[in-house]
Amino acid sequence: MFSKYVLATLLALFAQSMCIQELSLPPEGSHSTAATRSKKAKTAISEDIMYNYLMQFDYLPKSDLETGALRTEDQLKEAIRSLQSFGNITVTGEIDSATARLIQKPRCGVGDRRSADSFSPDNLYHEIGSNVRVRRFALQGPKWSRTDLTWSMVNRSMPDASKVERMVQTALDVWANHSKLTFREVYSDQADIQILFARRAHGDGYKFDGPGQVLAHAFYPGEGRGGDAHFDADETWNFDGESDDSHGTNFLNVALHELGHSLGLAHSAIPDAVMFPWYQNNEVAGNLPDDDRYGIQQLYGTKEKTWGPYKPQTTTTTTTTTTMRAMIYRADKPAYWPWNNPSNNPNNDRNRARERQEEERRRQEKERRRQEEERRHQEEERRRQVEERQRQEEERWRQEQERQEEENRRRKIEHKSQWERNPSKERNRPRERQEMERRRQEQERQEQERQEQEDRRRERERDRQLEWERRNRNGAREPVTPTANTTPRPTNKPYPTVHRQHHHHNKPRKPKPDSCMTYYDAISIIRGELFIFRGPYLWRIGTSGLYNGYPTEIRRHWSALPENLTKVDAVYENKQRQIVFFIGREYYVFNSVMLAPGFPKPLASLGLPPTLTHIDASFVWGHNNRTYMTSGTLYWRIDDYTGQVELDYPRDMSIWSGVGYNIDAAFQYLDGKTYFFKNLGYWEFNDDRMKVAHARAKLSARRWMQCARSANEVDDEQRWTASLVSEGEETGRSGSRELRINHFILSILLLAIANWRS
């Protein structure tokens, strides 16, 4: 009995010791079977993830994708060591926790292997005999053959496009400030560097993986897609330059890194470098770390001269040997020799003054960029407000159209129901239709006659006004005496809108218009000077006033215009500094005074209606710097890059409140304000309120021709007040006459009633 109890106790103690052995950590060098199985299972899972990561970023060749399981363990460990060395973590060759954290960090999508080969221990920073450090940055592939590069943004319709453009320009400025590179934004698909936001597979063979890990990738300099930078649109980006990652990944830091690839730099193993492949939210503040600065200067040179060591050169003569030193220029990090730097000479203040001037210039440049950025923000806000107002106006117009259509449908239904209730009228329907058509034609004829009479009345009124202005200006010195062969006065539209090449050898020249008594066909700022067009003549006004010898014929400046030119409809200078003339159904484009090849062209080539006979005015609106054209009651906006009318035009001129229809001319003056002209007056336009600044037109001759007021001329306000007074007096006189007549009639009625009663 006792032996059985002892045996059971020993078995229990043995089982307990085995459990304790299983739960305890194995000693160093031990190989527990269970622990080995667990480690191998974990390593198999980690190796699968690690294989994909190492192949994606060039630590293992991509050609072995299908035979990856046949690699040796030594190859995998060597690749892991390269990754750990490049990532600046402890090199173990094992998939430890630090390595797992490293491969989970967001990073650039460009591979590391090609640049990792350059980072062997004997190529790191170390001191050599000449006390010069060897560069650690990596150069990859070709570089750009020139230093003036262009860039453009593909996704211009994305919500934060303006912020992206600003950040990209800031990143490019950082690279430009430390090299001889210059960057210019263009609106073309042929730019050297194209910025693209895309998702997943986007056609270049390097698809994105959604939010996290791969943030972007870029291509090294070259043709085609060379230099292009692509960013993952699924990422949460912070376009405000904030250092707090809670609002998203700092786009400025990522763009600075990717554009380094676009310029020819590969990845760097220095953690503080911009070209470190893993994302880190470091504040650059306009300065590059030394590693990146040496790399970009090795490729494209530096803006300023650096001081390096003297290289000894020996010159031998017949009697003595003299050692001479020459200064050489080094593109990488130079050695510093205080006695060779003239800025350390206390007697030399010129270098210090130059440094102060350079520092002041940089400060002013920074302030200028800040002001430019602020102005751009304000311009965007103003443009947004204008577009919102236009959208509301379009919505109101659309609702009005729908209401009218609904009203027309309702009337048709009521009319149809009336015919259905009274079938006997069906027989008279053709006759009524004919009668309605006859009435419509009669109304059109009467309306046309009324319009012609109104036009003739306006022409006579304008002629009388011009004659009155001439008499008040000249007084009794130049009396107007009509003769039998007097040339008829010009009418409101004295010149045809369609110009043809006819040769009138005996055609008399038109008299020069009076500068102070005429209206304007067109007006524009050309090369910073004011040009006013009337008939075949023009005035040219500079900073000192009207040039001598003007007005002169337009064809003396632009001889390629039609020989029988009688007037121009509109003129403006476009953003390419070309001068555009609109004459009838055609338009001409001049490079200075030379006609551009292929011109003239019809107005329809701009996307305008083929039935349009002329343009009233063309101008660049200072509010949004866009080009507009008007004709009659409509206006259009032109896309300056495609040269075509934008899709949602034309629109009604009533949007320009107070301007009215059928204007004569319009332009943007040097003060940035827009002015509209009609007859002898003009209006200044208030861009913020979208209406004219003054309801009554001001005389054009006083403002633009500096014409003085004559002694006999009556002020506009006095004339307006006098007209009101005269109307009031006339009303009072007519009222008193009516009162006397009424009293007389009342007396007669009373007498008649008295006689009838008697």
From Swiss-Prot:
Cofactor: Ca(2+); Zn(2+)
Induction conditions: In fat body cells induced by sorbitol and galactitol produced by hemocytes in the hemolymph, probably in response to Gram-negative bacterial infection.
Region (Disordered): 335-514
The keyword Disulfide bond appears for this protein: yes
A molecular function (GO) term: metalloendopeptidase activity
Composition-biased stretches (Basic and acidic residues): 349-476
Tissues in which the UniProt entry reports expression: Widely expressed during embryogenesis including in the mesoderm, developing gut, central and peripheral nervous systems and imaginal disks. In the embryonic nervous system, expressed in neurons and glia. In third instar larvae, strongly expressed in the morphogenetic furrow of eye imaginal disks and in the optic lobe region of the brain. Expressed in posterior follicle cells in all mature stage 14 follicles but not in earlier follicles and is also expressed in some anterior follicle cells that help form dorsal eggshell structures.
Basic residues biased stretches: 499-510
Pfam families in UniProt: Hemopexin, Peptidase_M10
Location within or outside the cell: Cell membrane
Annotated Low complexity bias: 338-348, 479-494
InterPro entries: Hemopexin-like_dom, Hemopexin-like_dom_sf, Hemopexin-like_repeat, M10A_MMP, MetalloPept_cat_dom_sf, Pept_M10_metallopeptidase, Pept_M10A, Peptidase_Metallo
Gene deletion effect: Defective larval tissue histolysis and epithelial fusion during metamorphosis. Impaired fasciculation of ISNb nerves. Conditional RNAi-mediated knockdown in the fat body reduced the imd/Relish-induced antibacterial response.
Bilayer disposition of the protein: Single-pass type I membrane protein
Binding positions (Zn(2+)): 257, 261, 267
Segments annotated as Hemopexin repeats: 513-561, 565-610, 612-659, 660-707
Coiled coil (residue ranges): none
GO biological process, one term: collagen catabolic process
Record-level GO cellular component terms: dendrite; external side of plasma membrane; extracellular matrix; extracellular space; plasma membrane
Signal peptide (from-to): 1-17
Keywords: Calcium, Cell membrane, Cleavage on pair of basic residues, Disulfide bond, Hydrolase, Membrane, Metal-binding, Metalloprotease, Protease, Repeat, Signal, Transmembrane, Transmembrane helix, Zinc, Zymogen
Disulfide bonds: 516-707
PANTHER family found in the cross-reference section: MATRIX METALLOPROTEINASE, MATRIX METALLOPROTEINASE 1, ISOFORM C-RELATED
Family: Belongs to the peptidase M10A family.
Function in brief: Has metalloproteinase activity. Proteolytically cleaves the PGRP-LC receptor; involved in gut-fat body innate immunological communication (GFIC)-mediated activation of the imd/Relish signal transduction pathway. Required for larval tissue histolysis during metamorphosis and is involved in pupal head eversion and fusion of the wing imaginal tissue. Required for growth of the dorsal air sac primordium and development of the dorsal air sacs. Promotes embryonic motor axon fasciculation. Cleaves and activates frac to promote motor axon bundling during outgrowth.
Record protein name field: Matrix metalloproteinase-2
Species assigned in the record: Drosophila melanogaster (Fruit fly)
Gene assigned in the entry: Mmp2
